[in-house]
Amino acid sequence: MANENLIKVKDEIYNCSVCGQCIKGPVDPLRPNPFFGDYLPERVCPMREKHRLITYSGSGMNSIARALLEGRLQVSDELVEAVQECVLCGHCVTNCGEVFNVVEGITEKRMKGHGVDTPEVVRAMKADFVKSGKEPTANVKKVAAAIEKGHNRFARSQSDRMSWVPKDMQIPKKGKLLFYVGCVATYRNSEIAQSFARVLNKAGIDFAILGEDEWCCGGPQLLNAGLVDQFEVQAKHNVEA
């Protein structure tokens, strides 16, 4: 069925009024500006800043989704590439939520105090694109291939999964609590995993790790790119390991 995933988030799509608040968020009156303050840089939509087009924004993504649902827009390679630009940072949700909190009485709580969940809309579009045969961008496919082949995003050996474990610690593979380490903490920022393991150990918590049986969660790289089937394979393995 066309737009199968978009239909599930239809309410989010039609709650977007295309007000543009998602692009830069609220004004900070304490920041210098010749008029009335400046926008918070940590709230700015990164793809909108890059392209300077409304298409590349939260409201733009919702407008695309609405057009797809209503049959006013057809999926093309250019459209897929544009939607893949969204990194799902969530700035738009935060910015939108502040607006609806202010005017909650006017909107009769239609948003229940939160903004339009545009990242969920974008995930749905990406998943529908993949189902229709439109592949993700080359960079996404490269990472997905590395995960499928070696079960981690960095194309590292699974035998290195235990390399972060401090030499003075012995961590079992069975315990009451599972510490899922993840690719980044395993291969790049091992001090994070080491520190957390020491905290658990100091607290006397009976924990375990999957070690070489741990696979990439696939969350950011697969699920956020619409590669739902491959993501589910990774998740199922980790649950059953």
Please place each PLM-identified region on the residue numbering.
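Ferredoxin-like iron-sulfur electron-transfer modules
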Residues: 1-21, 29-34, 39, 53, ...
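Iron-sulfur-cluster electron-transfer modules
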Residues: 10, 55-241
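Disulfide-rich extracellular modules and peptides
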Residues: 18-24, 47, 88, 98, ...
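Short regulatory "switch" loops immediately downstream of catalytic or recognition motifs
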Residues: 19-33, 95-104
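A common structural microfeature
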Residues: 42-44, 176-177
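Short amphipathic helix-turn modules centered on a small-residue break
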Residues: 43-57
